[in-house]
């Protein structure tokens, strides 16, 4: 997948969800950072069904004469990664930078990612230095990163940071993938030949609250487990085999104890038997739930419904485009 051509055009893709308070500063700083590169660029902002004035602000920014902003407006909220994929469908650049709209990852880091990619890398990841998140978020991030590394074998250490750079060849490969559950950094790494990570700054969130609460992090964990690997299913098979052997051994033990100690011992051991039985029943329900997750994902993929629906695409000096994806 490697493409060693010098980067001429940079596309910055930013998903936006209820970020009206930070958009003005985001646009100002991102444009300044891109101007400093001395390359052609565009800034593609994807409104993911915001309920505040975010979509209106993006539309106004894109309609200014000579604006390099492209506003992609989704009709409702589809999630961060679906919004980014919608942005990927409207890029022109040789290199694509993804960036969150909350300004925790400074836009001023964009030139450094472009410089690293210009050395011939397909994907440039980032590692957040001196993270300004809560203890819970840091621990959850470490757990998720560890899970990803073990299941994918990829050594990148901070998959939660969306400030990343992708060659256009990698973007095209990802757009050919139609699975519903998409975790972009992992998907990109599966197509990349050369990857690198660089340290970047991390700032406190100044406006609003994080869109990843406890339940969203739990859902993300389930998504990662079931969309990355079938290892949990293999583990369940091994666990089931071990349980069957232990159950057989326990049955033999009960028979021997009854023959040795008499029927009175067997009656007293009934509660132990029930305790073990409930443990096995609980394990079965866990296995059934995990299997259901896989079957549900297969069902969603077979239906082949679109990841998102685009309401409008707004560019400078062009009428709004209405289309479905």
From Swiss-Prot:
E.C. number(s) listed in UniProt: 2.4.2.53
One cellular component term from this protein's GO annotations in UniProt: plasma membrane
Designated name of the protein: Undecaprenyl-phosphate 4-deoxy-4-formamido-L-arabinose transferase
Membrane topology: Multi-pass membrane protein
Alphabetical GO biological process terms: 4-amino-4-deoxy-alpha-L-arabinopyranosyl undecaprenyl phosphate biosynthetic process; lipid A biosynthetic process; lipopolysaccharide biosynthetic process; response to antibiotic
Reactions listed under catalytic activity: UDP-4-deoxy-4-formamido-beta-L-arabinose + di-trans,octa-cis-undecaprenyl phosphate = 4-deoxy-4-formamido-alpha-L-arabinopyranosyl di-trans,octa-cis-undecaprenyl phosphate + UDP
Matching PANTHER family: UNDECAPRENYL-PHOSPHATE 4-DEOXY-4-FORMAMIDO-L-ARABINOSE TRANSFERASE, UNDECAPRENYL-PHOSPHATE 4-DEOXY-4-FORMAMIDO-L-ARABINOSE TRANSFERASE-RELATED
Organism superkingdom: Bacteria
Family per similarity comment: Belongs to the glycosyltransferase 2 family.
Transmembrane segments: 236-256, 270-290
Keyword hit for Protein transport: no
Classification via InterPro entries: ArnC_tfrase, Glyco_trans_2-like, Glycosyltransferase_2, Nucleotide-diphossugar_trans
Record pathway: Glycolipid biosynthesis; 4-amino-4-deoxy-alpha-L-arabinose undecaprenyl phosphate biosynthesis; 4-amino-4-deoxy-alpha-L-arabinose undecaprenyl phosphate from UDP-4-deoxy-4-formamido-beta-L-arabinose and undecaprenyl phosphate: step 1/2; Bacterial outer membrane biogenesis; lipopolysaccharide biosynthesis
